[in-house]
């Protein structure tokens, strides 16, 4: 498989994968992209590009997972295994900082969405997430973008996880996002148990899922219907969990 960046901002992600995937892959319980070559820019194409071994599977759809508990356990084991990788010399993850760093863009997205969502309810949920205790332990690895588009299902099991451009170390709570962007409510406890998330981390993970969905929704409203639909799904799932 060949990955060709469509804009210069994506070029560092491929270099990141070329460096770190050979180290991470052998330590993880499911397949990840295996770089086998790298192309250099020339007069026909302006950026570096990567070649990977082909991975089998298909992207799952939120609300249509055939064996949700099994997938939840597989995803949780992947998250747990990634966290156990030693963080020495690893870069900071793209989404591994404090949740408060996303406060301004999240509130701006809520304002932009206006009457298209229940802005009062999502603001209250966002403020609740900001009150969750911060990560106080050592930095841990996270994938950073565990969305349905970066998960491959083979049969009814997790076959592979792709796109590690956001991966790095810090607070790993962002990797709990599949609980809301993919899994049904009944499968969330199995995912949480397999991942080993405590109450504070679960609250931060919910906050990450909400923030990412709120920011993506107005951005992709007209340009990427599948991502916009998944963002609406996440918001609805989190609203449905209100105490």
Where are these regions (language model features)?
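ATP-binding pocket architecture of kinase catalytic cores
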Residues: 1-98, 112
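Active-site acidic catalytic loop and adjacent metal/ATP-binding pocket
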Residues: 2, 35, 126-176
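Generic recognition of well-ordered alpha-helical segments
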Residues: 16-19, 23, 77, 124, ...
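A general structural signal for well-ordered alpha-helical segments in protein cores
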Residues: 17, 21, 48, 103-107, ...
